């Protein structure tokens, strides 16, 4: 371990890994610290949907940022594979966002003018996915809302960053960050280092660092419970989505089903009630799923914020300190754009001011400092 880095990134989930990669691309002397294994917690628990249209209901700066990040994924797989040899396992079948009522139809058809979104009648949906529920009224087909396997995206980011010169430290928690003259002091069990810039990207566990650095931004854990089943019986090529529940087909033959939303629950173990509610919604979309064999089940902690948007940007009083945390349900989707934005800020490049304003650390909608 060196004594000094140009940039230290705290948190080895998909957000921190993406930041380390984009900084390494800029030839920044970068270190990435993770208390456990890279991508081992919230990132591995995610289904990996790149659902800009599914998750973002308002056409604001957040939606624009999500669409930008979704577009970045189009060339990302090849770029990372060339450096890391890791396949991010992108599945390009698209998504059916299902309607089960006239109210659903009216809401979904507000997206008709968007690129890559098409309305399908009930008959057209069932022609494409014959095992979807016969109770649907139709669906919006979203061609660009594809999915990846998050653990492998994170792994690819980490290996690619390392190939470009970043130093990676697993099982090395950052204990403390403080301002020390012209440099920033970072304390770890393996030794102390200094950095010109520090980026906090520790998901729901970022609150400790906000507090150490004089900020009161709160993070709320929102537990999500998922399961996977083996699908040996029916064809399913597209993600099915309704009422914040999804069924995602994997190339392995598994279907990933999720997810609950339990605010304030720090437990990373699913409970029977949560799994039951997920399966109830899944059977509504795909009745045949009730006969499939269970593969496994798990839970993860989404990093929630007061207004549901992430913190991405500089410390309001110290431009050397940056934050990228609080991505809630959208960490996988937003990772490329977040990594590039943080890198651009550190490199003093021109950035989109609407995004900076929407995600600024001191926005009144989210926190009082």
UniProtKB/Swiss-Prot annotation:
Activity response to pH changes: Optimum pH is 8.0.
Keywords: Cytoplasm, FAD, Flavoprotein, Herbicide resistance, Oxidoreductase, Thiamine biosynthesis
Pathway: Cofactor biosynthesis; thiamine diphosphate biosynthesis
Extent of the signal sequence: none
Enzyme Commission code: 1.4.3.19
GO CC terms of this entry: cytoplasm
Superkingdom of this protein's organism: Bacteria
Cofactor note: Binds 1 FAD per subunit.
Reaction(s) this enzyme catalyzes, per UniProt: glycine + O2 + H2O = glyoxylate + H2O2 + NH4(+); N-ethylglycine + O2 + H2O = ethylamine + glyoxylate + H2O2; sarcosine + O2 + H2O = methylamine + glyoxylate + H2O2; D-alanine + O2 + H2O = pyruvate + H2O2 + NH4(+)
Gene3D superfamilies: D-Amino Acid Oxidase, subunit A, domain 2 (3.30.9.10), FAD/NAD(P)-binding domain (3.50.50.60)
Residues given in the record as substrate binding sites: 302, 329
InterPro entries (UniProt xref): FAD-dep_OxRdtase (IPR006076), FAD/NAD-bd_sf (IPR036188), Gly_oxidase_ThiO (IPR012727)
Gene Ontology terms for molecular function: FAD binding; glycine oxidase activity
PANTHER family found in the cross-reference section: GLYCINE OXIDASE, SARCOSINE DEHYDROGENASE-RELATED
Functional note: Catalyzes the FAD-dependent oxidative deamination of various amines and D-amino acids to yield the corresponding alpha-keto acids, ammonia/amine, and hydrogen peroxide. Oxidizes sarcosine (N-methylglycine), N-ethylglycine and glycine. Can also oxidize the herbicide glyphosate (N-phosphonomethylglycine). Displays lower activities on D-alanine, D-valine, D-proline and D-methionine. Does not act on L-amino acids and other D-amino acids.
Protein name: Glycine oxidase
Organism: Bacillus subtilis (strain 168)
